[in-house]
From Swiss-Prot:
Protein name as catalogued: Lipoyl synthase, mitochondrial
UniProt keyword annotation of 4Fe-4S present: yes
Organism: Sorghum bicolor (Sorghum)
Gene from which the chain derives: LIP1
Reactions catalysed, as given in the entry: [[Fe-S] cluster scaffold protein carrying a second [4Fe-4S](2+) cluster] + N(6)-octanoyl-L-lysyl-[protein] + 2 oxidized [2Fe-2S]-[ferredoxin] + 2 S-adenosyl-L-methionine + 4 H(+) = [[Fe-S] cluster scaffold protein] + N(6)-[(R)-dihydrolipoyl]-L-lysyl-[protein] + 4 Fe(3+) + 2 hydrogen sulfide + 2 5'-deoxyadenosine + 2 L-methionine + 2 reduced [2Fe-2S]-[ferredoxin]
UniProt record similarity statement: Belongs to the radical SAM superfamily. Lipoyl synthase family.
Segments forming domain Radical SAM core: 129-349
Entry's cofactor comment: Binds 2 [4Fe-4S] clusters per subunit. One cluster is coordinated with 3 cysteines and an exchangeable S-adenosyl-L-methionine.
């Protein structure tokens, strides 16, 4: 803390002691090109009153034509940061990848993997190191009613109505893949009376009817904080209730849609823990590289843990296009590892942290699956001994 204060004080001194540049003391670009152009007239030597002082300050702070020409030459827009070597992506491919993509097209289903341009798409769809292919299915259409500054999903105030056959189609598709763990997510649907929670719950229930042994994670929107919507999904038969806070508390308005906020998201996670059956895990995710400080990350982690959240993931924010907010910094793998260790120390049951990690990252699902099965085993043992 003292070090940061000392740095801030030294920067302040440097700024206040920097010589000001006035129009009269700096040659303009026109004077450089043509010496015959007269210099701007200096301000009056002594003009009484506040008006004179205001004029003097404005003239002292004003940029010269040379300054203006320089700003036009170099541009005023911030240049995007170059990607470091640890952010290189792999090219999607493989038989499993092709099969999943073909099935999705056949049933006209959407995945957040594609819509959000996830860098792990190739690894997850092809099976990766675990050999189990994973896709995060996006329901309620492909058009969101919100417009977060980081997200590449299409937006509209009046998206098309949900497909009534979608819950059945999604359940049949997932059941046919032979997966053990699936993530179902959705766009925000503020246009619907129940925010789409009934559609979400129906999808989970139909899938459970076809594949009772399948583990289901639901990555849900905030439902505007409506307790009835949260309860409907939390009691639908899922194993993991996930809702992302996306960024630290201080940057919520800069990163997320104005209808989302930190308290509302924390309340949703708390309600899910309250409504869901015992043993249901809660999970959230934070993007790094949005302009947050380490102190803000730690403070946010503490509040998330206090809400009873079991699993947290950290990943690097990647700018989907030039229309979206720029990357503030590329956080190093070493920093991600420190956040992981700190999360474990705080009591999170599982922490996935790395530049390429996303909230639905398959490595996280692999370990969460093991956690759920371990909890089931303990419950069975306890029932047998009772």
């Amino acid at each position: 803390m003292h070090g940061r204060r000392h740095l801030a004080a030294s920067l302040t001194r440097a700024l206040t002691q920097a010589p000001s540049r006035s129009i009269s003391s700096t040659p303009s670009l026109l004077q450089t090109l043509d010496p015959s152009v007269p210099s701007p007239s200096p301000p009056p030597a002594a003009e009484p009153g506040r008006l004179a002082e205001l004029r003097r300050r404005l003239q002292a702070d004003a940029p010269s034509l040379g300054d203006f020409a320089y700003s036009v030459e170099v541009g005023t827009r911030q240049r995007p940061l170059p990607k470091p070597k640890w952010m290189k992506e792999t090219v999607p491919g493989g038989a499993k990848y092709a099969a999943i993509k073909a099935k999705l097209r056949e049933l006209k289903l959407h995945t957040v993997c594609e819509e959000a341009r996830c860098p792990n798409l190739g690894e997850c769809w092809s099976g990766g190191e675990t050999g189990t292919a994973t896709a995060t299915i996006m329901i309620l259409g492909d058009t969101c009613t919100r417009g977060c500054r980081f997200c590449n999903v299409k937006t509209s105030r009046t998206p098309p109505p949900p497909d009534p056959d979608e819950p059945s189609n999604v359940a049949q598709a997932i059941a046919s893949w032979g997966l053990e763990y699936i993530v179902i997510t959705s766009v925000d649907r503020d246009d619907l009376p129940d925010q789409g929670s009934g559609h979400f719950a129906e999808t989970v229930q139909k899938l459970k009817a076809l594949k009772p042994e399948m583990l289901i994670e639901a990555l849900v929107p905030d439902f505007r904080g409506d307790p009835s919507c949260v309860e409907k999904v939390a009691t639908s038969g899922l194993h993991v209730f996930a809702h992302n806070i996306e960024t630290v508390e201080e940057l919520q308005r800069n990163v997320r849609d104005y209808r989302a906020n930190f308290k509302q998201s924390i309340d949703v996670l708390k309600m899910a823990k309250e409504y869901a059956p015992p043993g249901t895990l809660t999970k959230t995710s934070i993007m790094l590289g949005c302009g947050e400080t380490p102190d803000q990350v730690i403070s946010t982690m503490e509040k998330v843990r206090a809400a009873g959240v079991d699993v947290i993931t950290f990943g690097q924010y990647m700018r989907p296009s030039k229309r979206h907010m720029p990357v503030s910094e590329y956080v190093t793998p070493e920093a991600f590892e420190k956040y992981r260790a700190l999360g474990v120390e705080m009591g999170f049951r599982y922490v996935a942290s790395g530049p390429m990690v996303r909230s639905s990252y398959k490595a996280g699902e692999f370990y969460i699956k093991a956690m759920i099965e371990a909890d089931r085993s303990k419950a069975t043992t306890a029932d047998s001994s009772a």
